[in-house]
Regions:
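Beta1/beta-strand and adjacent pyrophosphate-binding region of the FAD-binding site
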Residues: 1-13
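Fold-independent oxyanion-binding glycine-rich loops
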Residues: 10, 32-33, 120-122
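Conserved active-site and cofactor/substrate-binding residues in soluble primary-metabolism enzymes
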Residues: 12, 16, 63, 67-70, ...
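N-terminal FAD cofactor-binding segment of flavoenzymes
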Residues: 19-81
C-alpha cells in the first residue's frame, strides 16, 4: 500500500516526523514557510532552528528530558543523530551549535528521496 503524508512545519517535530515516515517508505510533502515568511523568533531559513543552544536539555535518565531522549534514541531518532554531530560541551546537557544542527537537519531532510520540501506558507488546511 502506498501512503502519502503532509507535514506542516520543518521544526523539530515536523522534521523528526517527516524523516521517520520517509524511512518507513512513506512519501512525505513537508511544508515550511521560511524563507518566504519568518516568525518573530526565527532568523535563519534552516530547518529545526533552535532559539537557544541548550534547547535539548539534560541527559540524565532521572530527568524527564533525559529519559525522553533515551527513548527517542532507542526508536532511532534522526534529530538526535544530528544533534550528536553538532554537539558542544555543556556538562550534563545536550547542547548543540544551533547553526550546525539546523544545517545538518536541513541537509538530512532535503537529501531524503521520500521527502518533497515545499517552501511556502500554508494559509488553510
Amino acid at each position: 500500500m502506498n501512503y502519502k503524508v503532509t507535514v506542516l512545519g520543518a521544526g523539530l517535530a515536523g522534521c523528526e516526523a517527516a524523516l521517520w515516515l520517509a524511512g518507513k517508505g512513506v512519501q512525505v510533502d513537508l511544508y515550511e514557510q521560511k524563507p518566504v515568511h519568518f516568525s518573530p523568533a526565527h532568523k535563519s531559513a534552516g530547518f529545526a532552528e533552535l532559539i537557544c543552544s541548550n534547547s535539548l536539555k539534560a541527559e540524565r535518565l532521572d530527568s524527564a528530558s533525559g529519559l525522553l531522549k533515551e527513548e527517542m534514541r532507542r526508536m532511532g531518532s534522526q534529530l538526535l543523530n544530528a544533534a550528536e554531530t553538532a554537539r558542544v560541551a555543556a556538562g550534563g546537557a545536550l547542547a548543540v551549535d544551533r547553526d550546525a544542527f539546523s544545517a545538518e537537519v536541513t541537509r538530512m531532510v532535503e537529501s531524503c528521496e521520500n521527502i518533497t520540501v515545499h517552501r511556502e506558507r500554508v494559509e488553510h488546511i
